[in-house]
C-alpha cells in the first residue's frame, strides 16, 4: 500500500504533497500553488480526486490524483454559497457537502463523474456550522452548529436535497460548541469534539428505542489546565481502538483508548505537538498520526505505539504558511 499525505497551507496558498513510507518517513513530491486560501480537503471515495475549499472567492476545486504517486492536476471548480470551513462527500461519490462557519449554512454540490457541477441545496440558520459528516450507512448527515450547541440531522435524498429527520437535532451541554466528528468502524457510535469546552461526546447512533443518545462526555484537558479551551480536530484509528483530539491553546493531542464495542473512551495521555494544531489525521494503516501546526508552519509525524495508543515522534517537516488541514490517501 502506497500512501500520500496532503497538507493545505492557506497563508501561502499551497498544497504540499508527501509520500509516506512504511517506516513513517515523509518525502516531498509536489508543491501545488492554489488560486486562493486553501483550507478543507477530502479525497473522493474512489480515490481519483482531491476536493478542496478555497477563499476568498468561495469555491470547491477538484484535483485529479495520479494513481502511481498521488500527484495533483487541476480538473474542475464550482462556486459555493459561503466560505468553506469543512468539506466531505457521501460514500458513493455523488455529492460534496460543505459547512460554512461564517455563512451559517451547509451546502450540497452535485458530482458528475467525480467533478463538481453546481450546488443543489443549501440549508441556512446553522450558526457556526463547522462540519458535515455522513454516517457510515450513507443515510444521515450530521451537521454541528457550534454557536447553537446542536447537531442537526438530515437525510440526503437521491437528488441531493437535505431533509430534516425526526428528531431533527441532538443538543450538547450549553457552551460546548460541537465542531468535528468521526464514526466508529462498527457504525454504532459517533464521537464529536467540542471546541469551546474541549470535551469529547460519545453518541450512540441508535439505542433499542430508536433514539440517539449521548452516553459519555470526557474532558480532553489535563486537570491543572486553566487557560482558554480551544479544541479543533478529532480522528480515530481504522481498527477503532484509539481516538485522538487536539487543543490549539495547549498545543496538545489527547490520546484516548476505545472500548471494544465503541461505547466508552478512556483518557490515556497527552502528546505535546506543533504550535496551534488546527488539523491532523491518522494514516490508513493505523500506525502513524500526522499533525500540522498553524503557527509553527511545520508538521510532525508520530508512531502510534502500544495498547494505549501513545504517540512517539518520528519526524518533523517544514510545510507552507499556516497549515490547517491534513488528508491521507492510500493507493
UniProtKB/Swiss-Prot annotation:
Single GO molecular function: 6-phosphogluconolactonase activity
N6-acetyllysine: modified positions: 287
EC number: 3.1.1.31
Keyword field: Acetylation, Carbohydrate metabolism, Glucose metabolism, Hydrolase
Pfam families: Lactonase
Catalytic activity of the protein: 6-phospho-D-glucono-1,5-lactone + H2O = 6-phospho-D-gluconate + H(+)
Transmembrane annotation, as ranges: none
Metabolic or biological pathway, per its Swiss-Prot or TrEMBL entry: Carbohydrate degradation; pentose phosphate pathway; D-ribulose 5-phosphate from D-glucose 6-phosphate (oxidative stage): step 2/3
Function: Catalyzes the hydrolysis of 6-phosphogluconolactone to 6-phosphogluconate.
Name the UniProt record assigns to this protein: 6-phosphogluconolactonase
Gene name of this polypeptide: pgl
Amino acid at each position: 500500500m502506497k500512501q500520500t499525505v496532503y497538507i493545505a497551507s492557506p497563508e501561502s496558498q499551497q498544497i504540499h504533497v508527501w509520500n509516506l513510507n512504511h517506516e513513517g518517513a515523509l518525502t516531498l513530491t509536489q508543491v501545488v500553488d492554489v488560486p486562493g486560501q486553501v483550507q478543507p480537503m477530502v479525497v473522493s471515495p474512489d480515490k481519483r480526486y482531491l476536493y478542496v475549499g478555497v477563499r476568498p472567492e468561495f469555491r470547491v476545486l477538484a484535483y485529479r490524483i495520479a494513481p502511481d504517486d498521488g500527484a495533483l492536476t487541476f480538473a474542475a471548480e464550482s462556486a459555493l454559497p459561503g466560505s468553506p470551513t469543512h468539506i466531505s462527500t457521501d460514500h458513493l461519490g455523488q455529492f460534496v457537502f460543505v459547512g460554512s462557519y461564517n455563512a451559517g449554512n451547509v451546502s450540497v454540490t452535485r458530482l458528475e463523474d467525480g467533478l463538481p457541477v453546481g450546488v443543489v441545496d443549501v440549508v441556512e440558520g446553522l450558526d457556526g456550522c463547522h462540519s458535515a459528516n455522513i454516517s457510515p450507512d450513507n443515510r444521515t448527515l450530521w451537521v454541528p452548529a457550534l454557536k447553537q450547541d446542536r447537531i442537526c440531522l438530515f437525510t440526503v435524498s437521491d437528488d441531493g436535497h437535505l431533509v430534516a429527520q425526526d428528531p431533527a437535532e441532538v443538543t450538547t451541554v450549553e457552551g460546548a460548541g460541537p465542531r468535528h466528528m468521526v464514526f466508529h468502524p462498527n457504525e454504532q457510535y459517533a464521537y464529536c469534539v467540542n471546541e469551546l469546552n474541549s470535551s469529547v461526546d460519545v453518541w450512540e447512533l441508535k439505542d433499542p428505542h430508536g433514539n440517539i443518545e449521548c452516553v459519555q462526555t470526557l474532558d480532553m484537558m489535563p486537570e491543572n489546565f486553566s487557560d482558554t479551551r480551544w479544541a479543533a480536530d478529532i480522528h480515530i484509528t481504522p481498527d477503532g481502538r484509539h481516538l485522538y483530539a487536539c487543543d490549539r491553546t495547549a498545543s496538545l493531542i489527547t490520546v484516548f483508548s476505545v472500548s471494544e464495542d465503541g461505547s466508552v473512551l478512556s483518557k490515556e495521555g497527552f502528546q505535546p505537538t506543533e504550535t496551534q494544531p488546527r488539523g491532523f489525521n491518522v494514516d490508513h494503516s493505523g500506525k502513524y498520526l500526522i499533525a500540522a501546526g498553524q503557527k509553527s508552519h511545520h508538521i510532525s509525524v508520530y508512531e502510534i505505539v502500544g495498547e494505549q495508543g501513545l504517540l512517539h515522534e518520528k519526524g518533523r517537516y517544514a510545510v507552507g504558511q499556516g497549515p490547517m488541514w491534513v488528508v491521507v490517501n492510500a493507493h
